[in-house]
A protein has these predicted regions:
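A short acidic/glycine-rich loop-to-helix N-cap element
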Residues: 270-277
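Generic enzyme active-site microenvironment
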Residues: 51, 77, 143, 246, ...
Length: 328
């Protein structure tokens, strides 16, 4: 029996719907359940063929468990080794090299010394910093935000150097980036599943959290824009090796700038994404997990971004599948 598990935290709707969907498909030899674990031996035998990870970014014990599970043959979505190493600034740099539109972005030294360090730890750091050069490169308005992490925490829109320093001086020992603000006239969040399927959702980041997914999900303003977002979303997720992710695009003058694409446990609660988007992600994720369980593929894939930089394009990036197949 092939067993699929889901590891989750505070979510209430996606995990049970995911399990129910897989079991209702009645695929011979495949079943799904909530992951149940205790203390883990280093030689723990494989209990799950596939695990969908929704929580290990917040709980170190789970992340360590998933790495060990992968070592013993479990396919983990998303790859716990790369997820541990990844950060948004690297992603911006990689995306830029891959030809995806990215606003000018810089990474900044910590405003305060990280715990356990002093000024002697910073002797390689230029002082004073070349602030004007950085401001000239990025431009204003700009967004000051952590180099990693999510949930719109510690994100500040700044219009002048004075506003920048006001907020930067409150960031403590967080490592921050400064990125040119995109004056967007359209904004989209895209689910990407299995590095194959893309679901574009009209999104309003300025609205209250429960109203950000625009009702009725109006389509992009042009077919060319839709195709560009699908292609770029697949390019990013294939390069980074993420099988479940969201990619956000802020569209300025018909150019989709990739703003946020490090979301390996993307929001999938029905209360925020709405029924139509919820149904899509449940179906697509369930089909992906079943396909993986039956595939017998290697649990840990090599990172492919290095090959892309060498000129090897993501396969079939120009032909994304837009909709998950309907499961009867």
């Amino acid at each position: 029996m092939k067993k699929i598990g889901i590891l989750f935290g505070m979510e209430n709707t996606f995990p049970p719907a995911f399990v129910e969907k897989i079991n209702s498909m009645k695929v011979e030899g495949v079943e799904a359940e909530f992951v149940k674990i205790g203390g883990i031996r280093m030689d723990e035998s494989k209990k799950y063929d596939v695990i969908i990870d929704r929580i290990s970014q917040d709980i170190q014990f789970y992340r360590a468990y998933l790495k060990n599970a992968a070592l013993h043959g479990t396919i983990v979505v998303n790859n716990p080794f790369w997820w541990t190493a990844d950060d948004k600034f690297f992603n911006y740099s990689l995306a830029h090299k891959l030809g995806v539109a990215i606003p000018p972005t810089v990474i900044l030294p910590h405003n305060k010394h990280p715990e356990g360090t002093t000024d002697r730890s910073m002797r390689n750091l230029m002082f004073p910093l070349n602030w004007q050069e950085l401001f000239d490169y990025v431009g204003f308005p700009a967004f000051l935000k952590p180099y990693s992490g999510g949930g719109w925490k510690h994100v500040y829109k700044v219009h002048t150097p004075e506003e920048f320093f006001h907020h930067y001086n409150q960031t403590g020992d967080l490592c921050m980036t400064l990125q040119r603000g995109v004056e967007f006239d359209e904004y989209y969040r895209c689910y990407v599943v299995g590095q194959e399927k893309v679901h574009i959702m009209k999104y309003d980041p300025k609205a209250p959290h429960h109203e950000r997914y625009v009702k009725g999900n109006p389509p992009p303003s042009s077919a060319a824009l839709r195709d560009r977002m699908e292609k770029d979303a697949l390019t990013l997720c294939r390069a980074l090796g993420y099988d479940l992710n969201t990619v956000e695009f802020a569209v300025e003058r018909s150019v989709p700038y990739a703003i946020d694409f490090l979301n390996p446990a993307p929001d999938a609660e029905i209360t925020s994404v709405g029924q139509e988007n919820f149904d899509w992600i449940v179906n697509a994720a369930a089909e992906m997990a079943v396909k993986m369980a039956l595939s017998g593929e290697s649990p840990v894939k090599e990172m492919r971004w290095a090959g892309f930089l060498a000129g090897n394009n993501p396969p079939n990036a120009e032909k994304p599948t837009r909709k998950a197949k309907k499961v009867k």
